[in-house]
């Protein structure tokens, strides 16, 4: 099976991965088309996807789970138009029934779904694929689009509000305080915004997207460039976290919510799958303790499902892992004690 119409195929002539921009970029505002209301919005997520898990983190940190409903896809991609031999796209599907299972997009393996495995149906429309939601929002003209999660869906207007995670988390942080369980938590405080913005920039290019530049590269030169920059940025994180508790200062911020999902996947997936094996995160003393610290922050662990994470990556891309074999380890313990309290004031 070829990469088809998926992100794996988004490479330049020199073999470098080039991520496409999100296409839905509406914002939640008090006086705009999309206002902050309880029960109006629905999130489509994957526990495997680091971008979607940013949004899940905010949902739990801000105490918005009673106000925004959620559907979670199965981790293993499927052919989204299985009866069309000319359409090779593989992507997210829903498998909400316990006892049901699916194979990978090339027909290999058997991977269970249902609530026992944190997989839900599409509670709004009964969609089979996330692609169906894009078709619904784009009047059937979605072919060629990257059918990504997270999706913030508006039940009133029956369309996608946003599929850009960085903007969704900003809005969840600031626009729903009237109904949020934690109204005082501000992950983008004014005094730290310059530091947060600076960190977000190099973390995104070097680490968040950097691991994909390594894993999806199709030339040695593109891989070498990406992996060198990735570890330069990880070394920078290690140095920074030797001086302060969090990546942008002394308190948990949006920058941590954006960095953490990549780090928590690194040793379990990226070291093998994306060839980022120069060094493990658990070999960085400050970074490893930081990962445990953030994970143990109330609300954050709800965004981590390692079965989803490993199952997705190792079973969804036949061009990278033809037999869909999922490695058994290393199964690191994120609940181990950490030493980050040494920075507490």
Regions found by a protein language model. Name each.
Residues 1-345:
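C-terminal alpha-helical interaction module
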């Amino acid at each position: 099976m070829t990469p088809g119409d998926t992100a794996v195929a988004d490479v330049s002539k020199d073999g470098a991965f080039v991520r496409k921009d999100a296409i839905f970029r509406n914002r939640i505002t008090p006086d705009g088309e999309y206002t902050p209301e309880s029960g109006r919005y629905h999130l489509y997520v994957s526990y495997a996807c680091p971008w979607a898990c940013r949004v899940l983190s905010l949902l739990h940190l801000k105490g918005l789970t009673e106000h925004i409903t959620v559907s979670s896809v199965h981790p293993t991609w499927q052919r989204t138009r299985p009866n069309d031999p000319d359409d090779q796209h593989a992507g997210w599907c829903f498998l909400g029934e316990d006892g049901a299972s699916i194979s990978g997009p090339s027909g290999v393996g058997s991977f269970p779904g249902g609530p026992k495995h944190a997989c839900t149906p599409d509670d709004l429309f009964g969609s089979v694929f996330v692609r169906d939601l894009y078709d619904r929002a784009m009047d059937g003209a979605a072919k060629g689009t990257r059918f990504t999660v997270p999706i913030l869906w508006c039940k009133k207007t029956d369309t996608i509000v946003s599929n850009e995670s960085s903007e969704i988390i900003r809005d969840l942080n600031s626009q729903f305080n009237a109904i949020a369980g934690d109204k005082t938590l501000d992950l983008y405080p004014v005094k730290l915004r310059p530091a947060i913005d600076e960190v977000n920039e190099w973390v995104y290019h070097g680490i968040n997207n950097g691991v994909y530049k390594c894993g999806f590269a199709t030339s040695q030169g593109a891989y070498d460039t990406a992996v060198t920059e990735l570890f330069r940025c990880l070394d920078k994180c290690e140095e920074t976290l030797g001086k302060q508790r969090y990546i942008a200062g002394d308190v948990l911020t949006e920058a941590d919510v954006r960095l953490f999902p990549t780090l928590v996947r690194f040793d379990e997936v990226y070291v093998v799958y994306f060839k980022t094996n120069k060094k493990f995160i658990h070999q960085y003393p400050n970074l490893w303790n930081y990962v445990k610290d953030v994970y143990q922050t109330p609300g954050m662990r709800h965004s981590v499902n390692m079965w989803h994470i490993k199952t997705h990556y190792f079973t969804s891309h036949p061009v990278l892992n033809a037999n869909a074999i999922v490695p058994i380890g290393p199964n690191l313990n994120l609940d181990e004690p950490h030493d980050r309290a040494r920075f507490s004031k």
